[in-house]
Amino acid sequence: MARVTVEDAVNQIGNRFDMILVAARRARQIAVQGKDPMVEEENDKPTVIALREIELGLVTADTLDADERQTVREREAAEIAAVAAIAEGRNDIL
C-alpha cells in the first residue's frame, strides 16, 4: 500500500480545497472514464495515482479543463458527423 503525503500536491495546486477538487476529478477520469494514468500504477488506487500526478505537476485544474473541453469537442464532432450521415441517407431516399 502506498503512503502518500499531500503536502507536495498542495504546494503544486495552491490550497487543500482546490487540491481535493482536482484530485477527485482526476481520480474519476482514471476510474470511471478509463483515462490512462500518467505515472506507473504500482497497484495503487485511482486517488493515489491522481495525487502522485499532481505532485509531479502533470495534472492541474487547467489541464483537466482543457482535457474536458477537448472531449466535448470530439463528442460534438462525432454527433455532427452522425447527423450528416443520416441527412445524406435521407436525401438519397427522397
From Swiss-Prot:
<comment type="function">
    <text>Promotes RNA polymerase assembly. Latches the N- and C-terminal regions of the beta' subunit thereby facilitating its interaction with the beta and alpha subunits.</text>
</comment>
<dbReference type="GO" id="GO:0000428">
    <property type="term" value="C:DNA-directed RNA polymerase complex"/>
</dbReference>
<dbReference type="GO" id="GO:0003899">
    <property type="term" value="F:DNA-directed RNA polymerase activity"/>
</dbReference>
<dbReference type="InterPro" id="IPR036161">
    <property type="entry name" value="RPB6/omega-like_sf"/>
</dbReference>
<keyword id="KW-0548">Nucleotidyltransferase</keyword>
<keyword id="KW-0808">Transferase</keyword>
<keyword id="KW-0240">DNA-directed RNA polymerase</keyword>
<protein>
    <recommendedName>
        <fullName>DNA-directed RNA polymerase subunit omega</fullName>
        <ecNumber>2.7.7.6</ecNumber>
    </recommendedName>
</protein>
<dbReference type="Pfam" id="PF01192">
    <property type="entry name" value="RNA_pol_Rpb6"/>
</dbReference>
<comment type="subunit">
    <text>Consists of a sigma factor and the RNAP core enzyme which is composed of 2 alpha chains, 1 beta chain, 1 beta' chain and 1 subunit omega.</text>
</comment>
<dbReference type="InterPro" id="IPR006110">
    <property type="entry name" value="Pol_omega/Rpo6/RPB6"/>
</dbReference>
<comment type="similarity">
    <text>Belongs to the RNA polymerase subunit omega family.</text>
</comment>
<dbReference type="GO" id="GO:0003677">
    <property type="term" value="F:DNA binding"/>
</dbReference>
<dbReference type="InterPro" id="IPR003716">
    <property type="entry name" value="DNA-dir_RNA_pol_omega"/>
</dbReference>
<keyword id="KW-0804">Transcription</keyword>
<dbReference type="GO" id="GO:0006351">
    <property type="term" value="P:DNA-templated transcription"/>
</dbReference>
